[in-house]
Amino acid sequence: MLSFTTKNSFRLLLLILSCISTIRAQFFVQSSSSNSSAVSTARSSVSRVSSSSSILSSSMVSSSSADSSSLTSSTSSRSLVSHTSSSTSIASISFTSFSFSSDSSTSSSSSASSDSSSSSSFSISSTSATSESSTSSTQTSTSSSSSLSSTPSSSSSPSTITSAPSTSSTPSTTAYNQGSTITSIINGKTILSNHYTTVTYTPSATADSSNKSKSSGLSKKNRNIVIGCVVGIGVPLILVILALIYMFCIQSSRTDFIDSDGKVVTAYRANKFTKWWYMLLGKKVSDEYHSDSPLGGSASSAGGLDLDEADDVMEQSSLFDVRIRDSDSVLPNANTADHNNTNSGGEPINSSVASNDIIEEKFYDEQGNELSPRNY
């Protein structure tokens, strides 16, 4: 009877512990209500705990019926029944702790630690219960020790499952790395990129047009001033330079001569431009003067008269010679007449020819040829 009461008290203690675990699970569910996934997993854990408690109660009922039947049996069979009942109760406890710890590991790291502490309390309570049952009989103590040795093997699997929260920290680290933004500038374009998107910023067309519209040159007023200075100073300067070039290089130098009649004759010398051009072509350049009208021509010999007028002048001069001849024949001196009618060789000459030689002025060209209005 003592063992029966001990078993009942042990079962009541297990019920109390299961209730406490459910209350703790509900408390942790309320604390993690911000996370929807944690709430759902916590609710599933609560439902599993309730199902495990119902299984535990049914096992207790079955164990009580087994105990009642064992009282009618012998002592050896009674110890055997107690051994099996204790092993089943320990197995149910280990199963309960396993299911609860596996559910709590998915909720959060804090709930996993609290659930692992609750599972440890279950193992302690089971250990104390088995120690009490070992005092009843030696065979039950050996069975309980064997069950205790089997309990850590079953509880070792929750320890491996509870180490899962250490891997749950990696999403936060990857989220931090994925949230980082990389900024780069390529060919004048700014590129912002992270794990999800890539944004490219290019200079706007309005900015380019505004920069092009801005001119860095002179203003309109200054430009007009510059144009006025160039036109007002540059154009007269160019005209002066052209005039100097014409006067000293292109214009031919001229010289005025006076002939025997007192007329002015103009002679021209080759200009510098012509000299340079002849030198370039390899021609001989002379500094002699050249006149438009030849020296001793009709204009100079006849006093600016043409050929017909010169003929009239010559006829008048011949008449003048005849008059002189008549006056010479009146003189009684024959020697003078003979002297006038003979030349240096003693030949008789015409007096008109002699008078023409005195009146007529002769002109010669550069080659020594005599120039006259008729043979020119």
UniProtKB/Swiss-Prot annotation:
Cellular location of this protein? Cell membrane
Tell me which Gene Ontology terms the entry assigns under biological process: fungal-type cell wall organization; IRE1-mediated unfolded protein response; pexophagy; positive regulation of cell integrity MAPK cascade; response to acidic pH; response to osmotic stress
Composition bias, kind Polar residues: at what positions? Answer: 331-355
**Gene Ontology CC terms, in alphabetical order:** fungal-type vacuole; mating projection tip; plasma membrane
Which sequence ranges are listed under topological domain Extracellular?
26-224
Q: Which residue ranges does the entry give as Cytoplasmic-facing topology?
A: 246-376
Q: Which residues are glycosylated?
A: 35, 211
Record's signal peptide? 1-25
What coarse category fits the chief subcellular location reported for this protein?
membrane
What is this protein's function?
Cell wall stress sensor. Involved in activation of a response that includes both stress-related increased chitin synthesis and the MPK1 mitogen-activated protein kinase cell integrity pathway. High-copy activator of the SKN7 transcription factor. Required during induction of MPK1 tyrosine phosphorylation under a variety of stress conditions. Required for PKC pathway activation under low pH conditions. Required for cell integrity signaling during pheromone-induced morphogenesis. Activates ROM1 or ROM2 catalyzed guanine nucleotide exchange toward RHO1 in cell wall integrity signaling.
Q: Tell me the subunit arrangement.
A: Interacts with ZEO1.
Q: What is this protein called?
A: Cell wall integrity sensor MID2
**What is the organism lineage in this UniProt record?**
Eukaryota, Fungi, Dikarya, Ascomycota, Saccharomycotina
